[in-house]
């Protein structure tokens, strides 16, 4: 399986170095690329030995995955992760089939109407507009949040084309985590949770 690991990073810290070390340990044959999402602090990139590409707007994860596919569109599969996900063991990438996604996700929701409204706005003119609107229940817009996943080429291409309205700030990124969760679960045959293979580090990054 020809695998590319894409790491989305913003204002990177030592977490990025630890993430890279884990990828190299558990996926030694995979290629790696970092997509930066308009960082103010980039000093950590001087310590890495993989390509770093700069996306000069705050499109966060989905923008990173889209740019990576534009630059590296010929891989069999893509491990798309945030730089705060530290690998703990190897995913069975060889068993990934064309109608399957392995995803790091949690079940959570919005507590404010404006974030739910933003999710609906971001899906305007897409095939997911009606279903996102339907999932909005009172003040609690509850969906699985997917922002990191192992995905076959064809499914990543589909998501990028099906969700063209990219987020431009952190609030938009929060909304898009829910939108991606909905799009992934509705577009593949099965979703396998990969949380056990990563340690999520939480910080105060903006």
Region locations from a protein language model:
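ER/Golgi luminal nucleotide-sugar-dependent glycosyltransferases, focusing on the catalytic module
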Residues: 1-206
């Amino acid at each position: 399986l020809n695998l590319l690991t894409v790491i989305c990073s913003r204002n990177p810290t030592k977490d990025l170095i630890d993430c890279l070390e884990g990828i190299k340990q558990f996926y030694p044959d995979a290629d790696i690329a970092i997509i930066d999402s308009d960082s103010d602090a980039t000093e950590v990139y001087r310590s890495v030995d993989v390509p770093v590409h700069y996306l000069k707007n705050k499109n966060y994860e989905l923008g990173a995955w889209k740019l990576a596919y534009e630059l590296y569109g010929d891989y069999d599969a893509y491990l798309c992760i945030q730089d705060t996900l530290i690998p703990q063991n190897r995913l069975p990438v060889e068993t990934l089939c064309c109608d399957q996604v392995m995803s790091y996700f949690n079940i959570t929701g919005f507590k404010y109407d404006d974030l739910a409204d933003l999710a609906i706005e971001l899906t305007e003119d897409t095939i997911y507009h009606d279903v996102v609107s339907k999932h909005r229940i009172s003040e609690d817009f509850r969906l699985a949040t997917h922002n990191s996943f192992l995905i076959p080429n064809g499914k990543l291409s589909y998501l990028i084309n099906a969700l063209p309205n990219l987020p431009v700030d952190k609030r938009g990124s929060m909304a898009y985590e829910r939108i991606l969760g909905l799009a992934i679960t509705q577009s593949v045959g099965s979703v396998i949770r990969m949380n056990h293979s990563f340690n999520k580090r939480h910080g105060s990054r903006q």
